[in-house]
């Protein structure tokens, strides 16, 4: 389940390394923020980007 409804208008900023349009997110999910590493796709709870960079720490 992805709480990020990316079909809505808005912006999803992933730290300072990524900005996604057409997305209304309070937290960056992989579905709207492609800067997350591919490994996060294996995370059951999804990928949440935190901080200024997106790395394996986004996996929860």
From Swiss-Prot:
Residues binding a divalent metal cation 7: 49, 54, 58-59
Ligand binding (a divalent metal cation 5): 33, 35-36, 49
Positions annotated to bind a divalent metal cation 1: 4, 6, 20, 23
Gene3D superfamilies per record: Metallothionein Isoform II
Residues binding a divalent metal cation 4: 32-33, 43, 47
PANTHER family: METALLOTHIONEIN, METALLOTHIONEIN-1X
Binding-site residues for a divalent metal cation 2, renumbered to this chain: 6, 12, 14, 25
Region (Beta): 1-28
Keyword Metal-binding set for record: yes
A molecular-function term among this protein's GO annotations: metal ion binding
Domain notes: Class I metallothioneins contain 2 metal-binding domains: four divalent ions are chelated within cluster A of the alpha domain and are coordinated via cysteinyl thiolate bridges to 11 cysteine ligands. Cluster B, the corresponding region within the beta domain, can ligate three divalent ions to 9 cysteines.
Residues annotated to bind a divalent metal cation 3: 14, 18, 23, 28
Family to which the UniProt record says this protein belongs: Belongs to the metallothionein superfamily. Type 1 family.
InterPro entries reported in the protein's UniProt record: Metalthion_dom_sf, Metalthion_dom_sf_vert, Metalthion_vert, Metalthion_vert_metal_BS
Protein name per the record: Metallothionein
Gene name as annotated: mt
